[in-house]
Each structure stands twice: as structure tokens, then as C-alpha cells.
Amino acid sequence: MKLFMVLVASFAFAVALPSKKREETAENELTGDLQEAAQPMIYAVAFPEIRASCVIGWKQQGAKCERDCECCGVAATCITRSTNSLPGFCGYRQTPNVLGQGLLYTADTISNGLSAIFCAA
């Protein structure tokens, strides 16, 4: 009788506990969902939207330009084509890599700051 009670209690205990594999699977799914949900928020904090407050005479995105200081925006650059005979256009250099995009934004901002000094002269 005691053996029967021990077996029943063991069986009930084993059934009541979820398996370790099921817990790990659920935990991995939740962790993946959390990471997917957090990625856009991280990107939004790291690279806020570029809000351009333009001075009269500055060119909007897509307009033809010759120098970076002509374009409206902190990181807007005059993107030139491979041949120098064609004029460039105002825009933002982009890359699909988040880190690379941050580096481009930083480099373009510094470049625009320096070119603004030379354009003013």
C-alpha cells in the first residue's frame, strides 16, 4: 500500500511539473519577441528623425547642388555622381547597417559643420 501511494504521488508530481524543454522553448520565444519589439525603439533613440529647419535659400532633399552647405539638414550632403561633370543632389547617405548609419550621420554632421565655415567665407 505504501509503495502504491509513493508511485501515485511520484506520478502526480511528475505530471504537475512542466518539462524543462517546454519552459526553455517558451522562454526563448518570449526573449526573441522582446528583442524584436525593442529593436525599433533602440533605433529610434539612437537615431532620431532628422528635422530640418531650413534657412531661406537652402535646398530641399532631391534638389541640385554643388556643395554640402547648400543642402537643408544637419546631415544632408550634396551627393555627387561618379562623373564630376554632372551636378549633385541634396540627400542623406544611407546604409542598411544600424552602426554604419550612425557613423555616416556623425561624419556627415561634422562635414557639414566644417563646410558651413568655408561656405560662409
Swiss-Prot record:
SS bond partners: C54-C72, C65-C78, C69-C119, C71-C90
GO cellular component: extracellular region
GO MF assignments: ion channel regulator activity; toxin activity
Keywords: Disulfide bond, Ion channel impairing toxin, Knottin, Secreted, Signal, Toxin
Organism: Trittame loki
Comment field on protein domains: The presence of a 'disulfide through disulfide knot' structurally defines this protein as a knottin.
Superkingdom field: Eukaryota
Function, as annotated: Ion channel inhibitor.
Family designation: Belongs to the neurotoxin 03 (Tx2) family. 03 subfamily.
This protein's name: U15-barytoxin-Tl1b
Tissues/organs with expression: Expressed by the venom gland.
UniProt signal peptide: 1-16
Localization per record: Secreted
